[in-house]
Amino acid sequence: MEFSVKNGSVEKQRTGCLVVGVYEPRRLSPAAEQLDKLSDGYLSNLLRKGDLEGRVGQTLLLHNVPNVPADRVLLVGCGKERELTERQYKQTIQKMVQVINDTGSTEAICFLTELHVKARSVYWNIRFAIEAIQENGYQYNEFKSVKPEIRRELRKIVFNIANRKDLTVSEQAVEQGKAVALGVIAAKNVANCPPNVCNPKYLSGLAKGLAKEYDNITTTVLDEKEMAALQMNAYLAVSRGSENDAYLSIIEYKGSPNPAAKPIVLVGKGLTFDTGGISIKPSDAMDEMKYDMGGAASVYGTMKAIAEMKLPLNVIGVLAGCENMPDGNAYRPGDILTTMSGLTVEVLNTDAEGRLVLCDTLTYVERFDPELVIDVATLTGACMIALGNHNSGLISPNNTLANDLLNAAEQADDKAWRLPMGEEYQEQLKSNFADLANIGGRLGGAITAGVFLSNFTKKYTWAHLDIAGTAWKSGAAKGATGRPVPLLSQFLINKAGV
């Protein structure tokens, strides 16, 4: 899809479809009012007859509107004026695309980005519209023998802006919106890939592919022999039951004009399939455990997005690829593992494997002397119980970093909620036989998992995002969401100051 912006009068637009808003109850938006005057009251006459009330999601497609040069005019309901929320705005944008795709139009000029969305700017309206449109058109058909028929559909959208002074920021919104949407799609494609294809080696191949695609990215991959030499014993214990070797992929993006600038490090849990190991999961919905690499997928997508945007930052993305399978060689409940940091961990449940992979990875990234580290993981079912599918869980001992992430989450409409930390949660991780237990009991499971990781992050500023509830959807709409690529991308945009 091609996107652009311009500043022009609605009555002069020659296009396949002109899109304007209608407020509830039956009130024309400013752009629609101009069309109404041009057409001698044609639109207002239709509203008086009750053809469109203006509720969010309602549409009315018109042909041959008097004196209007556009082939079609699409009226889109926008709800009550000045009360439009982000969610409703997304509905209006996606409904617009759905309707136009059912016509013969391949291009459209959209005036919906001129609408007032609560506490949002023109920049946000345009960027979010692009992300919503790309999300609406996403399909994963890689493994279908009969591909859906590709029909003539919308290929170009021009967003009109009311004030010429907003052109520069609007053009930036287009470029950043396209990049973030591309990152989200990349993350979805990786996460949706079946586990018999997307194993840890496949994941490392994708990481290497970024280095070939972008000049300012280099990729290093560690195999199990190299990890063993580094004493990454907890990570490797999880991998022991699988015939697919573990691989740790390090993607280095250098965009800062100061090559010595400390990097921001993103660590993604990459369990390409998680059976639970010896503590095996129930069979119901186990197929969805291919999404246990959602953290790695989102880091991969974010690295792609920032490379597209050419952000002036140094960022390192780490994909911790591994598979947790039951086998005669698999690690067991009761095992005690010596981590790369030297701390020992008693395994009480082999299905709490993500934190074992991450603890060694978090120790490994100390060598980069990072400005800060954010790990992203589908870590706990407890986070899903606590926050549902709407908010990612956030844990950090650093208020500044936590607030920066929450601010980015709000800006990107990729919500997160901060969970507490404290010594009392550390108490739940005590072991009679080792420095730590790998689980802390049923209560506060999302928090104790994050607190467990905090023991391996003492040498840098750190935050943890638990995306177990937000990385994918179940049911009829089953599939990866690409979250939290928008949150992470926005955080990095803010850090870059662009």
UniProtKB/Swiss-Prot annotation:
HAMAP family listed in its UniProt record: Cytosol_peptidase_M17
Residue numbers binding Mn(2+) 1: D274, D351, E353
Organism, as annotated: Glaesserella parasuis serovar 5 (strain SH0165)
PROSITE patterns named among the record's database cross-references: CYTOSOL_AP (PS00631)
Subcellular localization(s) per the UniProt record: Cytoplasm
Cofactor binding remark: Binds 2 manganese ions per subunit.
Gene3D superfamilies (alphabetical): Leucine Aminopeptidase, subunit E, domain 1, Zn peptidases
A molecular function GO annotation: metalloaminopeptidase activity
Binding-site positions, Mn(2+) 2: K269, D274, D292, E353
Transmembrane segments: none
InterPro entries to which the protein is assigned, alphabetical: Leucine_aapep/pepB (IPR011356), Macro_dom-like (IPR043472), Peptidase_M17_C (IPR000819), Peptidase_M17_leu_NH2_pept (IPR023042), Peptidase_M17_N (IPR008283)
Entry EC number(s): 3.4.11.1, 3.4.11.10
Entry protein name: Probable cytosol aminopeptidase
Catalytic activity: Release of an N-terminal amino acid, Xaa-|-Yaa-, in which Xaa is preferably Leu, but may be other amino acids including Pro although not Arg or Lys, and Yaa may be Pro. Amino acid amides and methyl esters are also readily hydrolyzed, but rates on arylamides are exceedingly low; Release of an N-terminal amino acid, preferentially leucine, but not glutamic or aspartic acids
